[in-house]
């Protein structure tokens, strides 16, 4: 991996995020729009609170629909939250010349959770990007409202150049 680089042109996602930050409830509107594009994420009712190159933070309320049979926050709901944070961070960080897709996830369940959840995805730097596909492992921590680390995930993103647009 190389040192931090300036993104040559912000992604469309990051441009929209930055525009909406000037409005009341801009992050809620943005999060709602993300869930329209990728509906499965709406199952955890996420709110993206931080989105910038190399970092994304997402919060989700402790709702009955996110519980398991024990009455605690479901492990797979935490995975959903982690994947959203990792994907949004990757999208905000990559130059517009490249695309990404998650191809793997490893998860450690560290503690039961019965509160609102907070996922943080961050990387120190991006790999060198060129004409060949590459992998980026995005670490994500999912914590409870009191800061207890409940889930640690590593999500592998396949990054490749965007194909040329047809004329």
In which residue ranges do the predicted regions lie?
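Hydrophobic beta-strand-centered segment that forms part of the acyl-chain substrate-binding groove
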Residues: 88-124
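Residues located in well-ordered beta-strands
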Residues: 47, 106-108, 120-122, 141, ...
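Hydrophobic core residues within well-ordered beta-strands of beta-rich domains
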Residues: 42, 101-103, 117, 136, ...
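Short coil/turn motifs at beta-sheet boundaries
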Residues: 39, 51, 98-100, 114, ...
